[in-house]
Swiss-Prot record:
Disruption phenotype: Leads to reduced expression of genes for the polyketide synthase PKS2, the cytochrome P450 monooxygenase P450, the alcohol dehydrogenase/quinone reductase YogA, the lipid transport exporter superfamily member RTA1 and the a major facilitator superfamily transporter MFS, as well as a marked reduction in phomenoic acid production. InterPro entries: Fun_TF, Zn2Cys6_DnaBD. Transcriptional regulator; part of the gene cluster that mediates the biosynthesis of phomenoic acid, a long chain aliphatic carboxylic acid that does not appear to be essential for pathogenicity but may play a role in allowing to outcompete other fungi in the environmental niche via its antifungal properties. Positively regulates the expression of the cluster and subsequent production of phomenoic acid. One of its GO terms (biological process) is positive regulation of transcription by RNA polymerase II. GO terms for molecular function: DNA-binding transcription factor activity, RNA polymerase II-specific; transcription cis-regulatory region binding; zinc ion binding. It is found in: Nucleus. Keywords: DNA-binding, Nucleus, Transcription, Transcription regulation, Zinc. One of its GO terms (cellular component) is nucleus. It comes from the Eukaryota. This is Phomenoic acid biosynthesis cluster-specific transcriptional regulator. PANTHER family: FINGER DOMAIN PROTEIN, PUTATIVE-RELATED, TRANSCRIPTIONAL ACTIVATOR PROTEIN UGA3. Residues 46-76 bind DNA.
Length: 521
């Protein structure tokens, strides 16, 4: 309950009231009489309530009878007027100075905005040092798998260019480095790192405010730089554990892309290539780790044309997610099949089941050895990556399509799941311990975790141990979210795929996107 009190103005010294003045002047006959009357008036001072009401007090101690008869607590006869507190009903306001408050808020917000803007430029150099010393050091081993076009040292020249980009991109990158640092320290078990949290939210607020200002300009709403800004916020949300708000940002980007003509219209753009590549992958992965009831045709329609997707995605299989394009295309088909199963009135069960078995056959026919032969270096790593993703994709195909009754829950498919689970359990430890491949193993690890509901406690223990270590190693909270989801699933007693995920989850480890080619309108 809220309480409000009405307070009087300044305290004032005792002054003779108009009643006292009349009494004094009517009775005064000489200077001596006047003095005597004034002394008597001081001795018989009216209580403060009688003064306020302009009535004659009866001077009773400790409180006058007139106040008592009126049902009022007598405030007494002191030299200083006591504060008068008046009870008001909750929510009731007697007065409000709109102009003063508004002016105060404007001055305050302007001061904060100015101070924040002034604080950004010096922090850019701190971000540069942190990125080169820590984040770049973590990313550099990926070059051993093949030259990564989006991983590079931030030189002084690039730093000067960064100062010229919109404020929301600069602050967004600072947020990424701060978040990386917090996760490396294990912020949840390190209360001493609260200063990093404060800095993070200061720059996060700057990012949101700056992007909102850009978005409010009509001719800039659908620009490349706004898409880059929203994607930066989206990746920040995912890095921070993927609370519910991240999905709104994903939907927002899809709407902007639609306003620009759709993915097919934007795909040829080289400057948008890293952004669209990132967005495609997040969209596909998100549609795997969600209930079928959350699948959205407007999202999946961007990915259902596998030939088109492979054409524009294959160039990034090495530098971005290490997900073999052929398998990713099958994942896209599975997503679309789950959507069809959700509305069975348009499709026959036999037709869906036949498609599902064809997809599973294509997945298991994928050859990691042949895929690795096309790589120029680290062929053993590439074979292991292909093997891990083949088994993870096969598990996704069987478990998710059984959940929507497209595939049967028979012993033959259960045996296949056991085999693929054993393959993951055999190859994931080495993949997670390698600096070259560890950041690409979250989705396969989640798949093993879902399959672990059918297996022994040792598999669950392995998954539960690896996810926090992956979070600290890579500098993102999303593995901790995966740990929470899987442990809740194991404890639920349920076993179907859709029962594991209460909402969409973006189990991807990418924390930033290359915006160096994005043009500012």
């Amino acid at each position: 309950m809220h309480m409000q009190f009405q307070l009087p103005g300044r305290r004032r010294r005792h002054r003779t009231t108009w009643i006292e003045w009349v009494l004094v002047h009517k009775s005064a006959r000489s200077g001596g009489e006047l003095k005597a009357v004034m002394e008597d008036s001081d001795r018989k001072r009216h209580c403060w309530q009688c003064r306020r009401s302009c009535v004659v007090c009866d001077f009773t101690q400790p409180g006058c009878q007139r106040c008592s008869a009126a049902g009022v607590s007598c405030p007494g006869y002191s030299d200083i007027e006591p504060r008068k507190l008046k009870w008001l009903a909750p929510g009731k306001v007697l007065s409000r100075n709109h102009k003063a408050n508004k002016a105060h808020l404007v001055r305050k917000s302007t001061t904060i905005a100015t101070a924040s803007a002034q604080a950004v430029e010096p922090k850019i150099s701190d971000w540069n040092m942190r990125y080169n010393a820590c984040i770049l050091e973590d990313l550099t081993p990926i070059h051993e798998l093949g030259r990564h076009p989006y991983i590079h040292h931030v030189s002084p020249e690039r730093l000067k260019e960064a100062i010229l980009v919109p404020e929301f991109l600069r602050s967004g990158l600072i947020c990424m480095t701060l978040n990386h640092r917090m996760n490396r320290l294990g912020i949840r078990s390190n209360p001493g790192a609260t200063d990093l949290v404060e800095k993070y939210y200061i720059h996060w607020g700057i990012t949101i405010r700056s992007l909102s200002e850009q978005f409010n300009v009509e001719n800039k709403r659908t620009s490349d730089v706004v898409i880059a800004g929203i994607l930066t916020i989206l990746l920040g949300d995912i890095q921070n554990g993927a609370q519910v708000s991240w999905l709104h940002h994903l939907d927002g980007i899809h709407k902007l892309v639609s306003l620009r003509g759709g993915f097919r219209a934007l795909a040829p753009s080289q400057r948008l290539a890293p952004l669209l590549n990132c967005l495609w992958f997040i969209g596909i992965i998100t549609n795997t780790t969600c209930p079928a009831s959350y699948l959205n045709l407007s999202t999946i329609s961007h990915f259902e044309a596998s030939d088109f997707m492979q054409e524009h995605y294959s160039f990034a299989s090495t530098p971005t997610q290490m997900f073999p394009p052929q398998l990713l295309a099958e994942v896209s088909k599975i997503n679309y099949l789950r959507l069809q199963a959700k509305s069975k009135k348009e499709y026959r069960d036999e037709h869906l089941s036949k498609d599902a078995y064809n997809i599973l056959e294509s997945i298991e026919a994928f050859s990691p050895e042949e895929s690795a032969q096309s790589k120029f270096s680290s062929k053993e790593d590439w074979m292991r990556i292909g093997t891990v993703y083949r088994s993870a994709t096969a598990l996704y195909c069987i478990l998710s399509l059984q959940s929507v009754s497209v595939l049967p829950e028979d012993s033959a498919l259960r045996t296949r799941c056991v085999i693929h689970g054993q393959v993951l359990l055999r190859h994931l430890p080495e993949s997670l311990s390698s600096a070259r491949t560890k950041r690409f193993m979250l989705w396969p690890l989640v798949l093993l975790g879902v399959e672990a509901v059918h297996s022994d406690m040792a598999t669950r223990a392995f998954v539960s141990k690896q996810l926090p270590e992956l979070s600290r190693s890579v500098g993102t909270s999303i593995p901790l979210t995966a740990q929470s989801v899987l442990e809740s699933f194991w404890a639920s007693g349920l076993k179907l795929w859709d029962a594991c995920f209460d909402r969409p989850y973006p189990f991807t480890m990418q924390i930033a996107v290359d915006v160096s080619q994005v043009s500012t309108p």
